[in-house]
């Protein structure tokens, strides 16, 4: 509507102002937005999901996520950090990120959060895989979590026949861009005389799949899980200790093909499984009477090839 007063025209027509006209970042080219996000920490990036649709579409894009993880992975090689989970059994579960040497105040953080709705339930945690962790609580629930953003998702309960306990392992298939959880179920009646646990049922859960359920898979290798064993993921394969034909062995599960294989371990007996760069290594435990740490590195699983070196550790008595 317009009114004419003398030679002036007064208009009171409302003009809709969009966010892109008020926010200078909305008109920024896509590659510049991605460049800015690449320099931010994951916890800060997660807040952009609520900022606007354009920023959310970038953050939730799989190509951007994969590129971000690759960049942060190579950065972490020069700035390794520790992730600790502490349960005080009275307040809540807390995660601690260790400090970086360059900026001790920037990377250190304490995050208090619950992987489930019951904070006083204890959890076993698997080693991180691309920033995510797999948790198992004492009510046999498997939980996938992001400790950086404190987001957790409980997977469907593992349906078993007569088996009581479950042992989950976590991995990633880079070809199909899929996270998978390998779960083995056992029962007390399947404990062997030596105390090892017989693996009977093997199931796989694929994160992000439309059918949110566990799938039964076949394992032709009869093996016994070593008590307290913890799986290690590296280059598309989950590794864990087990006994095969009464011999301590290294089991391999290829996440993509969902196939099992076994690697003979070097002698003498090894007791620790760890990542060694982009490879897998096994070591012995250090005792007061033992001053040598033997490290074996798996060079080629298909050829059963290992390399090794020895580290002389000062006597604990002299420290």
UniProtKB/Swiss-Prot annotation:
Query: F-box domain spans which residues?
Result: 22-71
- A Pfam family found in this protein is FBA_3
Q: Which InterPro entries has this protein been placed in?
A: F-box-assoc_dom_typ3, F-box-assoc_interact_dom, F-box-like_dom_sf, F-box_dom
- Entry GO terms, CC: chloroplast
This protein's name: Putative F-box protein At3g10790
> What organism is recorded for this protein?
Arabidopsis thaliana (Mouse-ear cress)
What is the phylogenetic placement of the source species in the record?
Eukaryota, Viridiplantae, Streptophyta, Embryophyta, Tracheophyta
Disulfide bonds, paired cysteine numbers: none
């Amino acid at each position: 509507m317009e009114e004419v007063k003398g030679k002036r025209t007064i208009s009171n027509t409302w003009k809709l102002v969009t966010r892109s006209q008020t926010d200078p970042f909305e008109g920024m080219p896509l590659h510049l937005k991605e460049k800015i996000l690449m320099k931010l920490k994951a916890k800060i990036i997660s807040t952009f999901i609520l900022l606007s649709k354009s920023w959310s579409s970038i953050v939730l894009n799989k190509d951007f996520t994969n590129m971000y993880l690759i960049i942060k992975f190579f950065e972490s090689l020069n700035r390794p950090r520790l992730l600790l989970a502490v349960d005080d059994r009275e307040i809540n579960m807390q995660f601690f990120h260790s400090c970086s040497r360059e900026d001790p105040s920037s990377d250190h953080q304490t995050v208090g959060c619950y992987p489930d709705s019951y904070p006083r339930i204890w959890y076993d945690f698997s080693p991180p895989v691309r920033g995510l962790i797999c948790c198992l609580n004492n009510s046999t629930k498997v939980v996938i979590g992001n400790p950086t953003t404190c987001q957790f998702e409980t997977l469907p309960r593992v349906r078993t026949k007569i088996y009581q306990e479950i042992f989950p392992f976590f991995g990633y298939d880079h070809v199909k861009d899929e996270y998978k959880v390998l779960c083995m179920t056992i029962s007390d009646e399947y404990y062997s005389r030596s105390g090892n646990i017989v693996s009977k049922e093997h199931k796989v859960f694929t994160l992000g799949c439309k059918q949110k359920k566990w799938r039964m898979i076949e394992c032709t290798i009869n093996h016994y899980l070593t008590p307290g064993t913890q799986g290690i993921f590296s280059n598309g394969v989950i590794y864990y200790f087990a006994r095969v034909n009464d011999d301590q062995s290294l089991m391999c599960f290829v996440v993509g093909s969902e196939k099992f294989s076994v690697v003979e371990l070097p002698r003498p007996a090894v007791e620790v499984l760890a990542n060694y760069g982009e490879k897998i290594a096994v070591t012995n435990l250090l005792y007061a009477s033992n001053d040598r740490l033997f490290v074996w590195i798996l060079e080629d699983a298909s050829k059963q090839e290992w390399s090794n070196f020895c580290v002389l550790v000062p006597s604990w008595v002299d420290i």
